[in-house]
A protein has these predicted regions:
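Cytosolic, long alpha-helical scaffolding segments
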Residues: 2-153
Length: 153
């Protein structure tokens, strides 16, 4: 992730664009970098807690993250084309998927709250927080992508 970020930043600094555009692109690059960092943090925590298999409820959260990622990727691929409205639709899909992710998070947390195994509750809560943070960062990146589209019009 660091190498990709460095390459992208070098391209950005050498591009002939307005400062506003450069700021928007920089924001997206740093947000993508923060997503990679959040994923790394999730993996570090899962490894530290020796977690190899997660509760079934996590599958729904991972699916929501995948939906966010696919919609964001699709939006970026359409950036700079004549499909601005599709990019806006993709960014809304990211926000909708994140909202659904938060709902899944609450359902799992409510179920965990009924458990007497505090170590299990703590571990799963920490992992869930990391996943929710990844989703939040994806949503922030989608908002910045939408900002770029609006500035391009």
């Amino acid at each position: 992730a660091f190498e990709i970020r460095t390459i992208n930043m070098n391209h950005l600094l050498n591009a002939f664009i307005t400062p506003i555009d450069r700021e928007s692109i920089y924001r997206v690059v740093t947000q993508l970098d923060s997503i990679a960092v959040s994923i790394k943090h999730f993996l570090v925590e899962a490894k530290a807690y020796n977690i190899h298999v997660l509760d079934d409820g996590f599958i729904d959260i991972f699916n929501k993250l995948l939906q966010c990622t696919n919609a964001l990727n699709s939006g970026f691929l359409k950036l700079g084309t004549s499909h601005e409205l599709e990019v806006i639709h993709n960014t809304q899909m990211v926000r909708d998927s994140y909202d659904a992710l938060v709902n899944e998070y609450v359902i799992i947390m409510a179920r965990l709250a009924k458990s007497n195994d505090m170590a299990d509750v703590f571990i799963h809560r920490e992992l869930l927080i990391q996943l929710r943070e990844i989703g939040k960062r994806l949503q922030g990146c989608a908002n910045s992508l939408e900002d770029i589209v609006i500035k391009m019009r």
